[in-house]
A protein has these predicted regions:
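HotDog/MaoC-like acyl-thioester-processing domains
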Residues: 2-13, 73-75, 86-145
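Alpha-helix boundary/capping residues
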Residues: 40, 48, 139-143
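Short aromatic/hydrophobic contact patches that present stacked aromatics
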Residues: 16, 66, 114
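Acidic-residue sensor for enzyme active/binding pockets
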Residues: 32, 64, 96
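Hydrophobic beta-strand-centered segment that forms part of the acyl-chain substrate-binding groove
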Residues: 44-93, 107-108
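Catalytic strand-loop segment that frames the active site of acyl-thioester-processing enzymes
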Residues: 1-47
Length: 145
């Protein structure tokens, strides 16, 4: 059980579940949730932040991730992934993603991951690019930094 709701997330991306996402128990396999979470964040960085993975000098590497599961999802269904930012540092970002069945006010899962942005050539931490910071600031939860 969770107290999270759709209202706690600033951007949503609908994702169609696939037959291949299902496991032997008849619901979306837990590992597929990570794919939904990654797709929601990366989709936001590309569509709202103008991130170009091929041309960017700074790239985000996932250094930590996790997910809590509350209820199953199935095929066929539309899955709404709500994205928020809970930490926006000099070179790192912590995202949280609520994974919702369409029209369900409570999430089926709550996942997170941390990106550390590194220079593509040196693989050393670098400042978060200004265009990405500007795109992520609206998703920062009140009281978080």
């Amino acid at each position: 059980m969770t107290t999270e709701t759709r209202d706690n997330f600033g951007h949503f991306l609908p994702i169609q579940s696939r037959w291949a996402d299902m496991d032997a128990y008849g619901h979306v396999n837990n590992a597929e949730f990570y794919s939904y979470i990654d797709t929601a964040v990366t989709g936001y960085l590309v569509s709202q932040g103008g991130h170009d993975k091929d041309a960017a000098t700074a790239i985000g590497l996932v250094v930590e991730s996790g997910c809590k599961y509350f209820k199953p999802l199935a095929f066929p269904s539309v899955i709404d992934c709500g994205v928020r930012v809970t930490k926006l540092g000099r070179s790192s970002v912590r995202y949280e993603v609520g994974v919702f069945a369409a029209y369900d006010p409570e999430p089926a899962a709550l996942g997170f991951f941390v990106h550390v942005f590194v220079d593509r050539d040196t693989m050393r931490p670098t400042d978060l690019p200004a265009h990405l910071r500007s795109a992520l600031e609206p998703l920062l939860r009140a009281g978080d930094a």
